[in-house]
């Protein structure tokens, strides 16, 4: 069952971040954060420092995208 994870950390450029992502386990959430920050800010994995990964209840999540993904029963890719 997927869960919403809140990932807190900072980068070597001094930028702090809090990202909420949906994943089956914490490892999946970390991979998504590395992917998103790498593509948006052109950061390498070694430039991203993860401070905390925690499970968040859907009712207390701040990300609308994460809330909507939790409502879906299944996703079909073509």
Curated annotation (Swiss-Prot):
Q: Which NCBIfam families match?
A: PRK00773.1-1
> What is the gene name?
rpl18a
Residues in coiled coil: none
* Protein name as annotated: Large ribosomal subunit protein eL20
Report the GO terms under cellular component.
ribonucleoprotein complex; ribosome
UniProt-listed GO biological process terms: translation
User: What is the species listed in this Swiss-Prot or TrEMBL entry?
Assistant: Pyrobaculum calidifontis (strain DSM 21063 / JCM 11548 / VA1)
> What quaternary structure, including any partners, is listed in this protein's UniProt entry?
Part of the 50S ribosomal subunit. Binds 23S rRNA.
The GO terms this record gives for MF are: large ribosomal subunit rRNA binding; structural constituent of ribosome
| Keywords tagged on the record | Ribonucleoprotein, Ribosomal protein, RNA-binding, rRNA-binding
Q: Which InterPro entries match?
A: Ribosomal_eL20, Ribosomal_eL20_dom
UniProt lists the family membership as follows: Belongs to the eukaryotic ribosomal protein eL20 family.
Transmembrane ranges? none
Superkingdom: Archaea
Matching entries from HAMAP family are given as: Ribosomal_eL20
């Amino acid at each position: 069952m997927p869960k919403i994870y809140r990932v807190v950390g900072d980068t070597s450029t001094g930028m702090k971040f809090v990202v909420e992502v949906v994943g089956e386990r914490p490892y999946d959430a970390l991979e998504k954060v590395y992917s998103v920050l790498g593509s948006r800010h052109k950061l390498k994995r070694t430039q991203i420092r993860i401070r905390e990964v925690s499970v968040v209840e859907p009712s207390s999540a701040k990300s609308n995208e994460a809330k909507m993904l939790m409502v879906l029963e299944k996703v079909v890719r073509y």
